[in-house]
Structure formats: C-alpha cells, structure tokens
Regions:
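ABC ATP-binding cassette signature C-motif
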Residues: 1-261, 308, 314-539
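Intracellular alpha-helical coupling/juxtamembrane segments of multi-pass membrane proteins
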Residues: 249-304
C-alpha cells in the first residue's frame, strides 16, 4: 500500500538513504528505528509528499487515505477539545461540515430555486458521511479522548487552555478518528502516561490498515509491530518480528558478517602472499595472473557498522543515613482539591521506589514534597542525615543558561574537571564531537533533559528523585542511563511512563489510590502480577 522503491535522499552533503526500499501493506505494523538524525521523519515527509526524493519512487495506493501524526501540531484555539478533535479528523469531518452548510442553504428562502440541486448533493454527502461512521463520530471522539487521558469535564473545555503536551493528545485523537487506510505516527507516546500508552497499544493492534511508527518506547514497539525497518548510515534494512527479535537478528547478522570478513581477510592474505612470492618466477606466471584476476573480481566484505555506544563510569555517591526521606501526617491541597490527607511514607537507604497513579493522583506532587520543592499544608516532609539530593523535573530544563554551550554548562558546574572527562560525559549523554558547542537555547527538549541528567549524575547525589527522566530520550541514551543507574549505590524515587525503565530499576512500588497509599515490596514486574494490572485505571 505504501512503498519506497530504490529511493535516495540527501540533506546537503549528508546522505540519508541510498537506493533504499521500504514497504508497508494493509495489516502490517512497521516500526521505523535508527539513531537520531538518520532520516526517520524524512521517510514520513516523503510519503506525505512534503519532501521529494532525489532518486527512486515513492508511491501510495490510489485513493488511499493517510493519517500523519508529527510533533508539530500547529495552533489550537477557539473551539472545545471535542470540536478540535472532530474538526481535524479528515474526510469524515469535512463531510460533516459540508452537511451543516447544506442544511443552512436548504433552509435559506433566498436559495429556494437551488433546492433540487442542494437536496441531491445533501443525499450524496449524507451517504458518504454515514459510510464513514459520521453519526457515531462524537461518541467515538469522546471514547478516543478518554482513552488518551482526557477527563469528561475537560473534553468540553477550550482547547486553547491546554498545555503543549495535551494539545499533542488532541492532534493524535484527530488522526485516530480519521480511520485512514494508512497511519504514520512519529513518536506518538512522547506526551502520554502509561494508561494512555496501553490504550493506544490496544487501538493500534486492532487497526486493519498499514501502520508505520517511530517510538523510543521499547515495550510499546514490542507489543505492536510485526516488522522493524532500520535506517542507519544510508542503509535501510527490514527485519521480521518485534523490536527484541530485531535486536537478536541484528546481532546475529553482525556476528556472521564479522566471521565472513575474517575468513575473507585470511584468504586474501594467503592469495597476496602467493602472488608476492611467485610473481617474479616465469614458471608461475600463469598461476600468478590467474590469482590476480581472481582477487580483482572478489567483492570485498566490510566489517559491520556498529553504532557507537558510549559508556561512562559514574562515581560512587557518598553514603547517606539509613532513613533517607520521611513524610508524616502530610496533607496537601490545591484550592478545594485535596491531593493527600494524613499521608505517611518512609524511604530507606538503597530502596528504589517507583510511583504509580492515574492522572491527577499526585505523583509529581509527591516527588515535589520529598524534594522540598513545595511544602505540605499539614504534617512534615524531611530528608534524613547526610542525604545529598538530586531532583530531576521537567521544569529543570528551564534552568539552563541561554548563550552557554553544552560544554560550557558542564564546565561551569565542574570547573576543576578535565576537558577530556567532561567531553566523555557529554558524549555518553548524546553530545559527541562538535555537538558540545551547541548553545542551550537551541537544544531540543530531549537534549536539554540529557544535559541536566549529565550534570546531575557526574557528581552523583545519594538520593535521586526523578520525574519522567526518560521523556524524549532515545533508546541508546535510555540504555546507557539504565546501565548507569543499575549500578547506582544510592536511593531512588521515580515516576516514569517507560515500563522497560521501571522494570529494570525499581524494587518497591507505591500506588496512589483514592483510598490512600498501597505499597508493594517487589519491583514493577512483581507489581503487575500482584496488582493484576500494568497501571492504575487499567482493567
């Protein structure tokens, strides 16, 4: 249904693809993977005819509708969340809008002489609107918006009041309501919580069209895709199966290619040695010439291009006291809304707590209380003896200084550290080479998050409070962060929508419920078994 055949594309001197082919047919769910900047979003823009290929052919099945979700959602205002979702839902919303115009036209006495033509057109549009499920559109829109985390009261409020992340959800709802023949989803999980991600998984698994998706959420890809297409170094390679299977296949292919390379190098060395030894002897001239021709015809096997995965050995944090954080009798309100009433919590040294709860349950509020970013209305929240706190929150990124580069930011924080050490730190967090000269004001959200985490972990605290630390991080950076934190000798309290991250790092779970706190002695994997759900609010 969607095909790229022998496509080449470059941005300036940088070659993204060379003679690359890719296909997605109805019923296929394709995960598009590769390092940042490899050209994943460019593939979507080529399919949508927003960019042109330098060579080859991009084709979409005739009359097929394509829904494209990108991170650029545009302006939203002047209508309710529900109206904004419906108005951008493609052909069905266009048909609904035309029906309303036709109804007004037919009721206009000044257009009585056009009534027959208007009635005929109304019948055609109404039939198409019905065929597209238009009469159930509002009900479907409410269902999709609820699945994406919108409370009923918010659905009928002004979309202009929403934050950027919630507007992203509205944009995603629009695309899902289109019921297109093909879906292109570029990082759809970036602004979703676990409950919404799980709902989206169910929705996409039942989608019957062609799906091409990018995501840094490993678990999400594993549950959805039937094929992985990797873009790396100008090459586009397809693998059957989910993300885990792709990694296994890729590793096996690399091992086989390395073995073939080694065998060929040994053979070439042997042949070259023979030629060098006998090239001056007339009695061996025919054999030497034969072997020279043989070498000329051999297609040289290259070593596989391995992605540079940079590791960084973080220092051991100072030891804290055994009691790291204590909340006693804590009450917290926002206006008339009570978030906590008489809450008690003790966090002890080297425990790794992840906090679960539906939207609005107070996960971020709990982390702010523990970190001292806000005060309780009643009760106490105190840190224990010798606790050195590291608090990562989304607003942390606003504290970077405009005009300073990545390297200067690290140097300002650690003036006595060597240049080599700081550049190694920057590279480990996704700023290799000249990227350290990027100024803070031009960094993306993900780059800012990586820089804040680099600053925090270089001189590590012994108590990490992390509010969505993996937002916008690519898989390689997440893997590096997980490996670093697996060996972290301190205490952790975290909120994350990344289930792979939670599984790897947590050993205690705190669930916020309307009836108070529920605690689980095992990590996230044990919580799923014990609670019977992957997240609160999921049956």
């Amino acid at each position: 249904m969607i095909q790229l055949h022998s496509v080449s594309k470059a941005h300036g001197a940088e070659i993204l693809f060379l003679d690359a082919s890719l296909a997605a047919f109805r019923g296929e769910r394709v995960g598009l993977v590769g390092p940042n900047g490899c050209g994943k979003s460019t593939v979507f823009r080529l399919i949508m005819d927003q960019e042109q290929a330098d060579g080859g052919q991009v084709s979409v099945e005739r009359n097929a509708t394509i829904g494209y979700f990108s991170q650029d959602v545009g302006e939203m205002s002047g209508e309710t969340v529900l109206e904004a979702s419906i108005s951008g839902a493609g052909e069905v919303s266009e048909a609904g809008a035309e029906l309303k115009l036709l109804e007004h036209a037919m009721a206009d006495p000044d257009r009585a002489d056009e009534l027959d033509r208007l009635l005929e057109r109304f019948g055609v549009v109404q039939s198409r609107f019905d065929e597209l499920g238009g009469y159930a559109l509002e009900a479907r829109a409410r269902e999709v918006l609820a699945g994406l985390g919108f409370r009923e009261a918010v659905i009928d409020e002004d979309v202009g009041k929403l934050s950027g992340g919630w507007k992203m959800r509205v944009a995603l709802a629009r695309i899902l309501l289109m019921r297109p023949d093909g879906l292109l989803l570029d990082e759809p999980t970036n602004h979703l919580d676990i409950e919404s991600i799980i709902w989206l998984e169910h929705f996409l698994r039942s989608f019957e069209g062609a799906l091409i998706i990018t995501s840094h959420d490993r678990e999400f890809l594993n549950r959805i895709v039937t094929k992985i297409v990797e873009i790396d170094g100008g090459n586009v390679i397809s693998y059957s199966g989910n993300y885990d299977f792709y990694e296994q296949q890729r590793a096996m292919a690399e091992t086989q290619q390395e073995a073939q390379y080694a065998r060929q190098q040994a053979m070439l060395a042997k042949e070259k040695a023979f030629i060098a030894r006998f090239k001056a002897r007339a009695s061996h001239a025919a054999q030497v010439q034969s072997r020279v021709k043989k070498l000329d015809k051999i297609e040289t096997i290259q070593l596989p291009k391995r992605r540079a995965v940079i590791e960084f050995d973080f220092r051991e944090p100072p030891r804290s006291g055994d009691d790291v954080a204590k909340l006693q009798g804590v009450t917290k309100r926002y206006g008339d809304l009570t978030i906590y009433q008489n809450l008690d919590l003790m966090i002890r040294r080297r425990e790794r707590w992840c906090v679960m709860g539906i939207n609005g349950a107070g996960k971020s509020t709990l982390l702010k209380l523990v970190a001292g970013a806000i005060e309780p209305d009643a009760g106490s929240a105190v840190l224990g003896a010798s606790v050195k706190l590291g608090y990562f929150a989304q607003h942390s990124m606003e504290m970077l200084t405009a005009g300073r580069t990545v390297f200067e930011t690290l140097q300002d924080a650690f003036p006595v550290s060597g240049v080599g050490s700081l550049k190694a730190l920057a590279a480990a967090f996704g700023f290799p080479g000249d990227d350290v000269e990027k100024r803070c004001e031009i960094l993306s959200g993900g780059e800012k998050a990586r820089l804040i985490l680099a600053k925090m972990l270089y001189d590590p605290p012994n108590f990490l409070v992390l509010d969505e630390p993996t937002n916008h991080l690519d898989m390689d950076t997440k893997a590096m962060l997980i490996k670093a934190l697996e060996n972290f000798a301190g205490t952790m309290l975290m909120v994350s929508h990344d289930r792979h991250f939670l599984r790897a790092l947590s050993d205690h779970v705190l669930e916020l419920t309307p009836d108070g706190l529920l605690t689980y002695g095992g990590g996230y994997a044990e919580y799923v078994v014990a609670a019977g759900h992957e997240a609160p609010g999921i049956g």
